Amino acid sequence: DNWWPKPPHQGPRPPRPRPKP
């Protein structure tokens, strides 16, 4: 399933840290 050009992968995105009060 690589018949369509995909953007370069930069690895898995880390979860956004929740802002602590």
Swiss-Prot record:
One Gene Ontology cellular component annotation held by this UniProt entry: extracellular region
Documented effect of changing residue 14 to A: Moderate effect on binding to nAChR from T.californica
Mutagenesis or variant effect for residue 6 to A: Severe effect on binding to nAChR from T.californica
Note: Negative results: has no effect on GABA(A) receptors alpha-1-beta-3-gamma-2/GABRA1-GABRB3-GABRG2 and alpha-2-beta-3-gamma-2/GABRA2-GABRB3-GABRG2 or on receptors HTR3A and HTR3A-HTR3B.
Species of the source: Azemiops feae
Localization in the cell: Secreted
Outcome reported for the amino acid change (mutating residue 5 to A): Severe effect on binding to nAChR from T.californica
Effect of residue 13 to A: Severe effect on binding to nAChR from T.californica
Record annotation: effect of changing residue 1 to A: No effect on binding to nAChR from T.californica
Composition bias, Pro residues: 1-14
Tissue-level expression: Expressed by the venom gland.
A molecular function GO annotation: ion channel regulator activity
Span list, region Implicated in receptor binding: 3-6, 8-11, 13-14
Documented effect of changing residue 21 to A: No effect on binding to nAChR from T.californica
Listed name of the protein: Azemiopsin
Alphabetical keyword list: Acetylcholine receptor inhibiting toxin, Ion channel impairing toxin, Neurotoxin, Postsynaptic neurotoxin, Secreted, Toxin
Sequence segments annotated as region (Disordered): 1-21
Subunit note: Monomer.
Role description: In vitro, reversibly blocks human muscle-type nicotinic acetylcholine receptors (nAChR) alpha-1-beta-1-epsilon-delta/CHRNA1-CHRNB1-CHRNE-CHRND (EC(50)=0.44 uM) and alpha-1-beta-1-gamma-delta/CHRNA1-CHRNB1-CHRNG-CHRND (EC(50)=1.56 uM). Binds to nAChR from T.californica (IC(50)=0.03-0.18 uM), human neuronal nAChR alpha-7/CHRNA7 (IC(50)=22 uM) and acetylcholine-binding proteins (AChBP) from L.stagnalis (IC(50)=63 uM) and A.californica (IC(50)=230 uM).
Superkingdom classification of source: Eukaryota
